[in-house]
Regions:
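Alpha-helical oligomerization interface recognition
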Residues: 86-126
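Conserved small/polar residues in nucleotide/adenosyl-binding loops
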Residues: 128-131
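N-terminal Rossmann-like dinucleotide-binding module
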Residues: 1-43
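Glycine/small-residue-rich loop that forms an oxyanion/phosphate-binding "nest" at active or ligand-binding sites
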Residues: 70, 74-77
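Short, surface-exposed acidic-centric catalytic microdomains
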Residues: 30-58, 63-68
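N-terminal glycine-rich "phosphate-gripper" loop used for MgATP/nucleotide binding
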Residues: 37-38, 61-62, 66, 80-96, ...
Length: 131
């Protein structure tokens, strides 16, 4: 059984698609073991709860600095012992240590062409005003 952690920042529509695909058997041999959000009170957390998936918030606002946040994020992920991490609308630059530790085990769902439309400011209206 593939153990999957999904990282989210907002509404969780991609998360819901994954939940539904696992539930209906489209995605097989997979267990969604955790959802991690960098924001409190987002709909993705409700979706996880409704599906019976453990969910945690690891917010940069709860840490003194970026290094402490990065370590908190990694510690939370490690606790789930994932085989795969899905970044489903996760609006955080992930730490290099995470990329190294989970090499070839991270999938990023990005709503636009990379690298043309990504980075700070491209979430929301800026995307629609770009060339």
């Amino acid at each position: 059984m593939l153990r999957v952690v999904v990282c989210v920042s907002g509404g969780g529509t991609n998360l819901q698609a994954i939940i539904d695909a696992v539930a209906d058997g489209t995605i097989t041999n997979t267990e969604l073991v955790g959802v991690i959000s960098n924001n409190y009170g987002v709909r993705a957390l409700e979706r996880a709860e409704k599906a019976g998936i453990d969910a945690k918030v690891v917010s940069p606002k709860d840490y003194e600095n970026r290094a402490a946040f990065n370590e908190g994020l990694l510690t939370t992920i490690r606790a789930y012992k994932p085989d795969l991490i899905v970044l489903a609308g996760f609006l955080v630059v992930i730490p290099e240590a995470m990329i190294e530790e989970y090499e070839n085990r991270i999938i990023n769902i990005h709503p636009s062409l990379i690298p043309s439309f990504c980075g700070t400011g491209y979430y929301g209206c800026l995307l629609y005003t770009s060339p």
